[in-house]
Amino acid sequence: MFKFMIQCCCFSLLCIQAVSQHQTVKATGVFNGIYSEPLFLSTSKSDIEKTQFHYSFQSLYLKGKSSIRQTSTLKNQKMWKKLSNGSPGETNGQANKITAITPSIGNNFKGNELKTWTPTDNAIAISNGGIIVSCVNYGVEYYLSNGTPLLQNFTWNDFVNNALLDQGKFDPRVIYDNQHDRFIIVLLHGFSSTTSKILVCFSKTNNPMDGWNIYQMSGNPYQEGAWSDYPTIGVNNDELFINCNRFGNAPNYDFKKTFIYQIGLAEGYAGNALQYGLWNHIYTPDNQDGLTLCPASDGMGNSLSEKMYFVQMMPDSGSFVYLYELQGKLSSPNKTFTASQYAIPHFEVCANALQKDPSTGFLDSLSTGNAWVQNAFYLNNTIHFISDADIGNGWCGIQYGRIYLDSAKAVVTQFGDQGTDLAYPAIASFAHDISDAGVVIAYTQSDSTITPQCGVISVDDGMNWSSLQTVKTGDTVVNILYPPNYAIQPERWGDYTGICRKYNATQPEAWMGAAYGANTPPRLASYGTWIAQLISNEPASLLTTKQEEFSINMYPNPATDMFTLEFDNTQAGIVKVFLRNAEGKLVKLLLNDYLRVSKNTVMFNKLALPNGVYFVEIQMGDQQLISQKLIINH
């Protein structure tokens, strides 16, 4: 095994970024299992292609997610602050450092329509073969990447088509499993402890038109008068992970705790009885309840064996990001579940967003939900996560962060402008290779000068933002919960936006599915889904020599027993140190971290390398600063 040691003298802050070391790692969670769940339903191509009734049932109710902790109180206070500070829709000129390259928008087209009282809850996945599965609360649709529809107007009742599952179906999630070339859909059923189910659906092939193996897992697994809400999902090589929050029955909907299903993939793809376990009693290191844990699958679809990471932030406010690590397969007798916390700048939930009817001038609001993590991914010992947060005076902006596992630090940066609201961001890797930390972010946007729309922004390897780019402007305001039938209240929005990397694309590529204001007959002033291909314009490497920013000393060379690299950097930022062979192939990423102006030392055991010529490269952001030859001679 290649052994190395990194010594860095100091760390600091980067403008709107913050770096900190994590606190004590603490064991948490109680595992129950292993259990078995038989196949509930198997659908086929003929089931999908036959004429459907297109029935959909939705229940308008107030779950009160914003009542968790102090979320509702803070949001109400911030709305008054927002309205009393300047004219809504007039940006204050707040500067964001714009140096990253804006993505290109490729194929894009209209997707699912929303014909219910709910928010869209967009979820999207694309296979290596270019088949898109797009989900909203109303139903599911399939497309080719050129926009050709394979399946449209397919409600969730059409998809399940079983009389035993006759309650409302909601909160869909979909993921493409790159290791097995299959899709997985997770869908919730029922709003009470007696009807709550988690429907877990595995595509039979890489073509979703060939049908699904569908399992019904309990949404009240602990028999405590609870039902499950707001799922998040992720996969590793062997297993599917589903996190849900449990709430009590009406009318209080009191929070009951969060929990995780750990489910074997092989049985689901084969249509055999599922093997699964449950994790409960999950707490942060500072003894707060676990809540909405976002699994972090590998961001490039690479192998992730016998572990899964989960990221949490509090829904109302906080000064920590929490990371959970589950080690061990379902069958392992030595599974562990640990929690750690990383200090970040204090964040708070933002106020609800604004929208203005251009024909009447009526000012209405859109719910911006909570400040918890929207989604996350893992890549090369770094966890990437995204949320929205108050960027000032109650306005919503995007909050993006990284947790560097090697150095146990978190870095957070925000983007936004007071006068407009950016909400429900979703993140995907935009990397050229595993050493690249660039990301692409889809978002929704609204203010008093525009109708609800969606867009895209990127952050490069050095944590520089691109400019905002609108993908689809709104066609109309949203007015689903209209008076006099319902009291004036924030229109539902979100609860999440869909994004998925296309894993086999030659140039970094992702696909988004996001909500915009649209007329969806017979209903007007609702939401449509816009599906878009996002293509990176960042070159694989930007070779700009700036050796004046570094001084370097390597010894001994030729190397004998231990190799030592000393370097001084005169500019703070994210620094990477690569070890490459004579052909330029990556042998080892020695460092990927934020460094202040400092003197640094990297050491490793040269006995781990065969004799030959190597190159040590130092890179800051996208710029290669040093490339130094190293000779290994045992």
Which functions belong to the PLM regions below?
Residues 21-539:
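C-terminal PAP-associated
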